[in-house]
Amino acid sequence: MTVTTVSLTLAAASSSSAATVFGFQDAYDPINWTFTNSNADGFVNTGGAPASISLTGGNNGSGGSGTTDYTTTAAAAGTVTFDWNYSTADGPFWDPFGYLLNGSFTQVTNNGGGVFQNGTSTFNVLAGDSFGFRIFTRDNLFGRARVTISNFSAPIPEPSTVLSLLVLGGLGAGLKYLKRN
């Protein structure tokens, strides 16, 4: 086996397209997510997983802004899609919901919309990107926002990519063994 063959095998393995996992399972099981409050007392309910999760924003009475985040790491490059069903007690301007991508917040709720909103959101990730969901509270007063996220799908590595990398590793180990003997 030559260096060129190894390079071609590695290139083929790394250029494989991603598969898609549907629901909060496998690489996107709730155990692989991180929950964070910053000046907020929100919470996440994963009892509906893998079909859905629910995120509830802060209302700690501080009068200051805060965030409730639920984030994970992209297992492969591809598209993340999810449906969301949102409600708030004090108006969407005060408690917007959206998604995070590498720390940047993209709001999906409409500040001028009703206290009940829903939709579908889609964005692209690269392997290793941090992404997730956020409820931002401007004031931590007058009630919380809640969102249920369902029909979640996200990219995972193709099984053939993993298999190719394992084969490549085995070939490399075999060559090293043969070279010694």
Regions found by a protein language model. Give the residues of each.
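A short, hydrophobic C-terminal helix/tail in secreted or cell-surface proteins
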Residues: E158-K176
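Extracellular carbohydrate recognition and processing domains
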Residues: G103-L126
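Short, surface-exposed beta-strand/strand-loop-strand elements in extracellular ectodomains
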Residues: W94-G103
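Sec/Tat signal peptide C-region and signal peptidase I cleavage site
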Residues: S14-A18
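Short beta-strand-plus-loop segments that form exposed binding edges in beta-rich domains
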Residues: F133-F142
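Short beta-strands within extracellular/lumenal beta-sheet-rich domains
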Residues: G57-A74, F116-S121, I149
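Extracellular glycan-recognition surfaces and repeat-rich motifs
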Residues: T20-A51
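Extended extracellular/luminal ectodomain segments enriched in beta-structured repeat modules
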Residues: T73-T81, G128
